[in-house]
Amino acid sequence: MEYVYQVAPEHGPRVVAIGGGTGLSTLLRGLKLYTKQITAIVTVADDGGGSGVLRQDLGMPPPGDIRHCMEALANVEPLMAQLLQYRFREGGLAGQSFGNLLLAALNGILPTFDQAVEGMSQVLAITGRILPVTTENVQLKAEFENGTSIVGESVIGAFKKEQNCRIKRVRLLPETAEALPAAIEAIEKAEMIIFAPGSLYTSIIPDLLVNGIVDAIKRSDALKVYACNIMTQEGETEGYTVSDHIRALFDHSCDGLFHLCLTNNGTLPQTVVEKYRQRGAEVIFCDKESCEAMGVEIISRAVATVDNGRVRHNSGHLARELMALHAERTIRVAGASKKQIPRYRRET
């Protein structure tokens, strides 16, 4: 169907996006054009960079991934947007971003981290809602096919390259971490659940490991879609196909967690692909038959872009295709004609 939503965003569907890192924030930038009813459920397993420093010094959950989502959904003047992204270059604050420090300050003022996130959301007048998947202090442990293991999200990639084998499983420590009740409620009320692109083992899967998340997804009648990465990731998914990504997600949750997977079929400049290959990454091969054998339908669309030599999802195209999938499903379920649903179209 050659369509995409053109309804007013305030009347858009209730969408939950699950993930972390730049993949989730990229998705959110596009989704806000189509619906105001967005809930981002964000991993808090990060322990590197400026987030890791604040986590260690202040005993708070890492703010970085949540800050990225704030930047994507904020409705502020350009100067405020610049301020959020400003990173100190020298002195004791070198490497820290103002956005991280703002969230850290709010965490000191307000009783809980999720309240601090809500407070920052109000300050920035964000579209939708951002929720940490849990407010508990969690770490990520990776176990490898050769029997070795390591603790710490920020060291998994380098350790994997040393071991030269695949990641077998990741776990949260403690394994008893409970999901934020608001996250469970959002999933249960969602009309569409999107597993965002991003680091498979360190951004997406950690959300699924928090107690209550997978059960809530299983109970939900929402349309569930995985937006697969475009390129493999050095230090995590070298050599992975689309079905390998899906299998990893199912192995850390349950078979049939979702039945649709959106992949990119747009072409990329060979010069860019070659540069990725030199760094140990490549375009993810879509082994459609293997995916279908797991009960997952592949939807392929041109959703990639190249920004400063980096392959990324085009936020507008990605959101547009996802909204089209939701609308098509709405038509089928309702048994309605296109005229009974707000018109939407795909631009060429």
List where the protein language model places each region.
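C-terminal functional extensions of proteins
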Residues: E2, G239-T348
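Conserved phosphate- and dinucleotide-binding cores of soluble alpha/beta proteins
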Residues: E2-H11, R29-Y34, T39-P61, A179, ...
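Metallocofactor- and cofactor-centric catalytic cores in central/energy metabolism, strongly enriched
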Residues: E2-P9, R14-I18, T22-L28, L33, ...
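Short beta-strand segments
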Residues: I18-G19, V42-T43, T134, A196, ...
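Electropositive, gly/pro-rich neighborhoods at or near active sites that engage anionic ligands
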Residues: A45-N164, E321-E328, A336-E347
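Glycine-rich phosphate/diphosphate-binding loops and the adjacent beta-loop-alpha structural elements
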Residues: L83-T112, G198-I205, M231-T237, L268, ...
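Active-site gating loop/helix substructures
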Residues: V138-P197
